[in-house]
């Protein structure tokens, strides 16, 4: 690893493979899946891959790193439905957040990281400031 971006240093806590249990507002059952976080060679980006065992929850890949211009970090997100989104992202004091402001479909997510597990809550607002839970996912580090 060479010259890892110091802004990404807190993401070291996520590196590894995680088993997931997700509950989506449109699906009655708990959906099993998995996720991996890994460094892209060079240490300037973190790559996230997720898989879910239900057709309504897409598989996805994301890349976390500095934006082309501006400050902070972004998550470039792509999924099996053909959806592509850009989120702002942060991981400070063990709390990971990502969000995007898109009129009619604002999104935000947060998780308080533990060493071996965490719950990630995804919310959306189709009307400004009227947030509703969209997805809750428990992540457990695979041994």
Map each language-model feature to its residues.
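Hydrophobic small-molecule pocket/channel-lining residues, especially in calycin-type beta-barrels
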Residues: 1-143
């Amino acid at each position: 690893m060479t010259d890892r971006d110091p802004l990404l240093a807190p993401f070291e806590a996520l590196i590894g493979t995680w088993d997931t249990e997700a509950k989506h507002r449109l699906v009655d059952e708990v959906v099993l899946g998995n996720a991996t976080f890994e460094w892209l060679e060079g240490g300037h980006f973190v790559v996230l891959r997720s898989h879910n065992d239900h057709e309504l929850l897409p598989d996805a890949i994301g890349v976390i790193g500095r934006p082309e211009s501006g400050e902070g970090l972004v998550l470039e997100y792509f999924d099996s439905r053909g959806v592509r989104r850009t989120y702002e992202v942060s991981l400070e004091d063990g709390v990971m957040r990502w969000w995007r402001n898109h009129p009619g479909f604002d999104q935000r997510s947060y998780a308080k990281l533990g060493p071996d597990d965490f719950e990630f809550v995804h919310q959306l607002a189709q009307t400004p400031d009227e947030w509703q839970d969209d997805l809750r996912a428990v992540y457990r580090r695979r041994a």
